[in-house]
C-alpha cells in the first residue's frame, strides 16, 4: 500500500499541477480591463489561456473583463486600489 502512495506522489510531481481560477484579469498596478462587449473580453481571456471571458455589467467590478479557467501565471485583480501612474 505504501508503494502505491509513493508511486502516485512521484507521478504527481513528474507531471506537475496546473491550476486555473475564475477572476477579473488585471493590467499593471492591479487595474481591471474595462469593457463594453463580451467579444472583447473573450478574445483577451482566451489569448491569455482562459477557457472564456465575459463583460458582466453586474458584480464587484462593473464592465470589467471576467475570465473563466484563467491560468495561475496570469495576473488577476486582488483586493486593494488600482494604482495608475
Curated annotation (Swiss-Prot):
Q: Which family does it belong to?
A: Belongs to the long (4 C-C) scorpion toxin superfamily. Sodium channel inhibitor family. Alpha subfamily.
The organs and tissues expressing this protein are described as: Expressed by the venom gland.
What S-S linkages are listed for this chain?
A: 31-82, 35-55, 41-65, 45-67
Record-annotated LCN-type CS-alpha/beta domain positions:
21-83
Q: Which SUPFAM superfamilies match?
A: Scorpion toxin-like
Protein name according to UniProt: Toxin BmKaIT1
Q: Which CDD domains match?
A: neurotoxins_LC_scorpion
SMART domains xrefs: Knot1
Q: Give me the Gene Ontology terms describing cellular component.
A: extracellular region
The record, for InterPro entries, names: LCN-type_CS_alpha_beta_dom, Scorpion_toxin-like, Scorpion_toxin-like_sf, Scorpion_toxinL, Scorpion_toxinL/defensin
Q: What is known of its domains?
A: Has the structural arrangement of an alpha-helix connected to antiparallel beta-sheets by disulfide bonds (CS-alpha/beta).
User: What keywords appear on the UniProt entry?
Assistant: Disulfide bond, Ion channel impairing toxin, Neurotoxin, Secreted, Signal, Toxin, Voltage-gated sodium channel impairing toxin
- Please tell me the species this chain comes from: Olivierus martensii (Manchurian scorpion)
Q: Where in the cell is it found?
A: Secreted
Signal peptide per UniProt: 1-19
Q: Which GO terms describe its biological process?
A: defense response
Propeptide positions: 84-85
Extra remark beyond the main annotation: Exists in two forms, due to cis-trans isomerization at 28-Asn-Tyr-29. Adopts a predominately cis conformation.
Give the protein's function.
Alpha toxins bind voltage-independently at site-3 of sodium channels (Nav) and inhibit the inactivation of the activated channels, thereby blocking neuronal transmission. Shows a high toxicity toward insects and moderate toxicity against mammals.
Which GO-annotated molecular functions does the record name? sodium channel inhibitor activity; toxin activity
Amino acid at each position: 500500500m505504501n508503494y502505491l502512495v509513493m508511486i502516485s506522489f512521484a507521478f504527481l510531481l513528474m507531471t506537475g499541477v496546473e491550476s486555473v481560477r475564475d477572476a477579473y484579469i488585471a493590467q499593471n498596478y492591479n487595474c481591471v480591463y474595462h469593457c463594453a462587449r463580451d467579444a472583447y473580453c473573450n478574445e483577451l481571456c482566451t489569448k491569455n489561456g482562459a477557457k472564456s471571458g465575459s463583460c458582466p455589467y453586474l458584480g464587484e467590478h462593473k464592465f470589467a473583463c471576467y475570465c473563466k479557467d484563467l491560468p495561475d501565471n496570469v495576473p488577476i485583480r486582488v483586493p486593494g486600489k488600482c494604482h495608475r501612474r
